[in-house]
Amino acid sequence: MVDLRYGSGNIFDEKVHEIGIIALGSFLENHGSALPIDTDAKIASYIALNVSIITGAKFLGVVIPSTEYSYVKHGIHDSIEDVITYIKYLIENGRKIGINKFLIVNCHGGNTIILDELSKLNFDDCFIQMESVCLTHAATEEVSLGYAVGILSEDKMKTHNPKIYEEIGMVGLKEAREKNEAIDLEAKSVEKNGVFLDKTHGKSLLNDLITNYVEIVRNMI
C-alpha cells in the first residue's frame, strides 16, 4: 500500500481531500448571439475548477445531462432521472477515492428541479450540497460573467438583442412567461433596461462567486 502524502501542495487542510466538487450546467441551450450554447456548463466548470485549485478539494468534472421546466423551450434537455443518474455515477466513483462530501456548483436554473431527488442521495456517511447561480438568461449579468470567464464574443454583442433572439431574458418565450411569474418579471426587466456588457461587474461577480464557493468548501471541512 502506497503511503499518500495528503498534506502536500497548496491546500486548506488534509480533510479537504474528502470533498469533491462537481460542475452542473447545460450544454445545449441557446444564449443569443454573443454567448455559446454551453454557457452554463462552462461557467459552472470554470468556477468549480478554480474553487478546487484554491482549496485543494477534488474537481470531479461536469455533469453532461441537464434538465429544465417543460414550458421553457430554448434548448435540448434531459429528464431529472438522467441528471441524477449521472450525479450518482460521479458520487459512487468519488467515494472510491475517499470523498464523502460533494459540492455541486450549478449554473443552470432549470436544474434546480432536481433538488428533491438529489436529497435522497444523502446518507450519514455521504453529504451532498448543491448551490446554484441563477442569472437572467443571456442578459446583462450572464453576458458580463461570460466576458470574465472568456466565452463572450464582444463583436456579436451588436446583434445580441431579445428582439432578434427570443431566449434572451426569455422575453419571447410566451409560455414560460405565462406559467412562471419570476421568469415574466425578469423578462420585463430586460424589456425595460436592455442588455449590455459591464466588464467591471462581470469580473467582480466572478470573483465574488468563486469566493463564496471557497467559503462553502471551508465550512464543509
Curated annotation (Swiss-Prot):
Associated pathway: Cofactor biosynthesis; coenzyme F420 biosynthesis; Cofactor biosynthesis; riboflavin biosynthesis
Catalytic reactions on record: 2-amino-5-formylamino-6-(5-phospho-D-ribosylamino)pyrimidin-4(3H)-one + H2O = 2,5-diamino-6-(1-D-ribosylamino)pyrimidin-4(3H)-one 5'-phosphate + formate + H(+)
InterPro entries assigned: Creatininase-like_sf, Creatininase/forma_Hydrolase, FAPy_deformylase
Cofactors: Fe(2+); Zn(2+)
Keyword Zinc: yes
Segment forming the signal sequence: none
Entry-linked Pfam families: Creatininase
Record keywords: Hydrolase, Iron, Metal-binding, Zinc
GO biological process: one example: F420-0 metabolic process
Note accompanying the cofactor annotation: Requires one Fe(2+) ion for activity. Requires an additional second metal ion that could be Fe(2+) or Zn(2+).
Enzyme class: hydrolase
Residues that hold Fe cation 1 according to the record: 29, 40, 108
EC number: 3.5.1.102
A single GO molecular function term of this UniProt record: ferrous iron binding
Positions annotated to bind Fe cation 2: 31, 40
Source taxon at top rank: Archaea
Subunit structure: Homodimer.
Family: Belongs to the creatininase superfamily. FAPy deformylase family.
Function in brief: Catalyzes the hydrolysis of the formamide of 2-amino-5-formylamino-6-ribosylamino-4(3H)-pyrimidinone 5'-monophosphate (FAPy) to form 2,5-diamino-6-ribosylamino-4(3H)-pyrimidinone 5'-phosphate (APy).
Annotated protein name in UniProt: 2-amino-5-formylamino-6-ribosylaminopyrimidin-4(3H)-one 5'-monophosphate deformylase
